[in-house]
From Swiss-Prot:
Keywords of the record: Cytoplasm, Ribosome biogenesis
Stated name of the protein: Ribosome maturation factor RimP
Cellular compartments annotated: Cytoplasm
Family the entry assigns: Belongs to the RimP family.
NCBIfam families: PRK00092.1-2 (NF000928)
One Pfam family in the UniProt entry: DUF150_C
């Protein structure tokens, strides 16, 4: 995480804690000529527009005070959505039994992408059951080899 994102997280985390919300992720991204500071929040049952607005107002006020980002940017606060990223240990633990999409830095048993049910997670290894054509396969993926992981929608 960059120094700017660490400073932003130090501002945002107390606000989400105060509002009893989970800070899922923070991204600072350039799209075309514009910069966007995106803050993703959640709670059991999901967040509503009023909670996003409350976080946005409080974060905007605190960011103006400490000003960790010098250039102009747009602030966006939203839910992570149905395909929520899995980043923290708790995210992986909560995803056990759910359908996930995982990519790795390098091939493992000839694959770099898996989409299936996360059967277990022990802190070091993800065990995923995938369907390959008509058969079920159980795959073990070391956590340190995971490039990205997120919840997925099963069709």
């Amino acid at each position: 995480m960059s120094k700017v994102l660490e400073q932003v997280e130090a501002i945002v985390a107390p606000i989400t804690d105060e509002l009893q919300l989970e800070l899922v992720d923070i991204a600072f991204e350039k799209e075309g000529p514009n910069w966007f500071l995106r803050i993703f929040i959640d709670k059991d049952g999901g967040v509503d527009i009023d909670e996003c607005a409350a976080v946005s107002e409080k974060v905007s006020e605190k960011m103006d005070e400490s000003d960790p980002i010098t250039q102009n940017y747009f602030l966006e606060v939203s839910s992570p959505g149905a395909e929520r990223p899995l980043k923290k240990e708790q995210d992986f633990e909560n995803a056990v039994g759910k359908y996930v999409h995982v990519t790795s830095y390098e091939p493992i048993d000839g694959r770099k992408m898996w989409e299936g049910t996360l059967v277990s997670y022990d802190g070091t290894t993800l065990v995923i059951t995938i369907t390959d054509k008509t058969r079920k396969i159980t795959c073990e993926i070391p956590k340190d080899k995971v490039a990205k992981a997120r919840l997925a929608i099963q069709f």
